[in-house]
Curated annotation (Swiss-Prot):
E.C. numbers: 2.7.11.1
Recorded family membership: Belongs to the protein kinase superfamily. Ser/Thr protein kinase family.
Reactions the enzyme catalyzes: L-seryl-[protein] + ATP = O-phospho-L-seryl-[protein] + ADP + H(+); L-threonyl-[protein] + ATP = O-phospho-L-threonyl-[protein] + ADP + H(+)
Name under which the protein is recorded: Serine/threonine-protein kinase-transforming protein mos
GO MF annotations, alphabetized: ATP binding; protein serine kinase activity; protein serine/threonine kinase activity
Residues annotated to bind ATP: 69-77, 90
Amino acid sequence: MPSPLSLCRYLPRELSPSVDSRSCSIPLVAPRKAGKLFLGTTPPRAPGLPRRLAWFSIDWEQVCLMHRLGSGGFGSVYKATYHGVPVAIKQVNKCTKDLRASQRSFWAELNIARLRHDNIVRVVAASTRTPEDSNSLGTIIMEFGGNVTLHQVIYGATRSPEPLSCREQLSLGKCLKYSLDVVNGLLFLHSQSILHLDLKPANILISEQDVCKISDFGCSQKLQDLRCRQSPHHIGGTYTHQAPEILKGEIATPKADIYSFGITLWQMTTREVPYSGEPQYVQYAVVAYNLRPSLTGAVFTASLTRKTLQNIIQNCWEARALQRPGAELLQRDLKAFRGALG
C-alpha cells in the first residue's frame, strides 16, 4: 500500500523486505492502553544465526496493531505501526477447505518482496511466525498510505467523513492520470517477469499524494513458474476481470493483466459495474460469445477524441491475447491520448 513516508528513511537497514520461515510460538494479541493492540514479545534469535539471515525476521515488540482495515477470502488487513511508522499488516488465514490455496496466497504476496517501484505496494517484512492458536499462516508488513481504493473512489464508498465526489475525482483527465500510474506499475512488474492476475479497482490503492499503487499480490505468479508447469493450473482472481484464456484454464501471460486493466479503465470512465448475472453464465459468455461491457455511452462516442479511448479499451480486452498491446505500448497510447486532450 502507498505510504506518505519513505520507510527507508525511518526503518533500520535490517528491516528491508524479508521472509522469516522459522517456526515460533508468540503470545496472543493482547489489548493495551489507548485501545491499541500489541503482538507481545518473541524468543530472541538463536545464537549463531548466519549474518545473511539477519533481516529474515520481524521485530514483534515494535508491532502495534491499531484496527482492522478489511478482510477477504485469504486473510485480514490491519492498520498498525512498525518502529513507529504507519504500516499495514496482512495476516493470511489457514483456509480449512483449501490449505494449499492459503499457502499459495501467502507466498505469492512475497513475489514482490524485494521490488521497488512508486506504483507498487512495498513489502517491509514478512514472517511465518503467528500468535499461538491463531488461524494464520503468516504475517506480511507492508507500507501504508490510507484507506482509499480506486474502487471506493469510482463508486463513492469511502470511509471518509466527507464522501468523495466521483465526478470531481474522476474526470477524464484524472482517469488517465490513474491509468498511467497503474500501467507504469504493470510495466515494471512484467519487466520483472511477475504477473498480478487479479488487477481490479479494489486492488489499487490511492495515496494521500494521489498516486495509485497496485496491491494484493495473493494471486500473482512468476513467469518462469508458469512455464515450468506441464499441466493447466488453477489461477485465482476475480471472474469479471479475468481474460478468456484464464477462464479456459490456459497458461497466463502478461496480456492477462492487460485485459484486466481494460475492464478497470472501463469502470473508471463509466463508473458502472462490468456485468450482471450469475458468474458461470458471465464466464461462459466472455469465452464463447466475446461478451464485454458496453462501449456505447457518450463518454466513448461524444467526439473523435473519445473514440480513441474506446479503441484503447477494446484493444486491451481483445479475445486473443496476442492482439492485446503490451504494457509499454499501452503506456505510449495513454500518453498520446492525454496529450491530445490538452
